[in-house]
Amino acid sequence: MTNIFTPIEEALEAYKNGEFLIVMDDEDRENEGDLIMAAELITQEKMAFLVRYSSGYVCVPLSEERANQLELPPMLANRSDRHGTAYTITCDFAEGTTTGISAHDRALTTRSLANPNSKPQDFIKPGHILPLRAVPGLLKKRRGHTEAAVQLSTLAGLQPAGVICELVRDEDGLMMRLDDCIQFGKKHGIKIININQLVEYISK
């Protein structure tokens, strides 16, 4: 089964070029595949694709430093998510958006969260994008999709921000598992990696 996964160097080239990656979690964790790409490179068309084939619960993982710069506090003082996902207050970019929910608006908000020139006052809270705080140390400390997205962006030499959403099956709306993700990747020409590969890559 190992040959279904793309080598990390090849995946990073695709990521730098604004392509999606399918990133598989550990089987004993969530065992799901997320579509992930660099936040700064998301377009309206890419966002529409992401929403169409996913749960639609679009999240933007940020480094802790970036989340602090934008003054994005935790959604709850004591988080209760069973996997320890660090949700912050939701937001929309203020300028150039309307309702905040369209593919255009969500792509603009996502790019703006990645933009180092954006300031806290540039965002309306609450909104339609869910920023996530990656833990310091990224995958060396927590093996989640949040950290994987920021790790990929960092390795690619991009801003420490990604955009992610869980892939779901058309027929029943359940999460895609590995076999589903393999078929989806083949159909749409999207490379697949897993978090274990990334951990091994950064440990070299």
Curated annotation (Swiss-Prot):
UniProt-annotated site: Essential for catalytic activity, residues: 128, 166
Cofactor comment text: Binds 2 divalent metal cations per subunit. Magnesium or manganese.
Keyword annotations: Glutathionylation, Lyase, Magnesium, Manganese, Metal-binding, Riboflavin biosynthesis
Chain sites annotated for binding Mg(2+) 2: 30, 145
Post-translational changes noted in the entry: S-glutathionylation is reversible and dependent on a glutaredoxin.
Binding site for D-ribulose 5-phosphate: 34, 85, 142-146
Binding site for Mg(2+) 1: 30
GO cellular component, one term: mitochondrial intermembrane space
Co-factor requirement: Mg(2+); Mn(2+)
UniProt pathway: Cofactor biosynthesis; riboflavin biosynthesis; 2-hydroxy-3-oxobutyl phosphate from D-ribulose 5-phosphate: step 1/1
Reaction(s) catalysed (UniProt annotation): D-ribulose 5-phosphate = (2S)-2-hydroxy-3-oxobutyl phosphate + formate + H(+)
Residues recorded as bearing S-glutathionyl cysteine in the entry: 59
Biological process according to GO: riboflavin biosynthetic process
Entry's EC annotation: 4.1.99.12
Signal peptide (residue range): none
The keyword Manganese appears for this protein: yes
InterPro entries from the UniProt entry: DHBP_synth_RibB-like_a/b_dom, DHBP_synthase_RibB
GO molecular function: 3,4-dihydroxy-2-butanone-4-phosphate synthase activity; metal ion binding
Protein family (similarity comment): Belongs to the DHBP synthase family.
Self-association and partners: Homodimer.
Its biological purpose: Catalyzes the conversion of D-ribulose 5-phosphate to formate and 3,4-dihydroxy-2-butanone 4-phosphate.
Record protein name field: 3,4-dihydroxy-2-butanone 4-phosphate synthase
Protein source organism: Candida albicans (strain SC5314 / ATCC MYA-2876) (Yeast)
Lineage: Eukaryota, Fungi, Dikarya, Ascomycota, Saccharomycotina
Gene (UniProt): RIB3
